[in-house]
Design a protein with these regions (language model features):
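Extreme N-terminal basic, low-complexity initiation segments
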Residues: 2-13
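Solvent-exposed interhelical
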Residues: 126
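Extended, alpha-helix-rich binding/interface surfaces that flank or overlap catalytic cores
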Residues: 131
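Membrane-anchoring alpha-helices and their flanking helix-loop junctions
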Residues: 34-123, 135-195
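Leucine-biased recognition of intrinsically disordered, low-complexity hydrophobic segments
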Residues: 11, 22-23
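Residue-identity detector for glycine
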Residues: 26-27, 37
Length: 195
């Protein structure tokens, strides 16, 4: 049972007799999940918290703590250099995040944790790191902490990174290993988790 699905920017070739079918998009490779991977598991990564909620919560908590129990110069007391440096970092984080999300859209898969991953991305920023969106969140968060002069936000980054690593990334990787099998293990061997 082989069929081709023509779309504006990519061609999907599906061969259910093989463990993995190939998606070719603009010369970039992605792998479809095997039939066994789709049938034998819940089809999403069971993360403890969605990363946007984790980072937004840390920003709000950091600002609240900075207001109630000030550390350092105080919330919103950044000078021009701090605003420029923090703003530049925030823009870098936003740009990296946008490039990363664009790869999901090009491949036709969901970027939202808790929804099925239909392809293994290996193009764009995913050639250099397995988690460019989370790196983008960290850069954006760090930039905001500098702009807001919130020492609490910087301190909260430590538990945020632990929760991100243990409660999100490790669970997503277990899901992707189960779903994409050998293709994901080869990707893990070739591309670092972070940088």
């Amino acid at each position: 049972a082989r069929h081709a699905d023509f779309r504006v920017s990519h061609l999907i070739v599906t061969d259910y007799d093989r463990p993995c079918a190939l998606l070719v998009s603009g010369g970039k490779r992605c792998f479809r999940a095997s039939r066994e991977g789709r049938q034998n598991m819940q089809d999403y990564a069971d993360v403890v918290v969605k990363p946007p909620i984790l980072f937004a919560g840390a920003v709000l908590l950091g600002c609240l703590l900075s207001w109630i129990v000030p550390l350092g110069p105080g919330l919103g007391s950044a000078n021009t250099r701090a605003l420029a440096a923090g703003g530049a970092l925030a823009l870098v984080g936003l740009a990296l995040g946008a490039l990363s999300v664009r790869e999901f859209r090009r491949a036709g898969t969901s970027v939202i944790p808790g929804e099925p991953s239909t392809v293994l991305l290996e193009s764009g920023p995913y050639r250099y790191t397995r988690n460019p969106i989370y790196i983008a969140f960290v850069i954006l968060y760090f930039g905001l902490a500098i702009m807001l002069t919130s020492a609490w936000m910087l301190l909260l980054l430590i538990p945020v990174l632990i929760i991100l690593e243990r409660g999100v990334v490790e669970r997503e990787e277990a899901y992707l290993q189960a779903k994409f099998g050998e293709a994901y293990r080869k990707y893990q061997a070739r591309v670092p988790r972070w940088l």
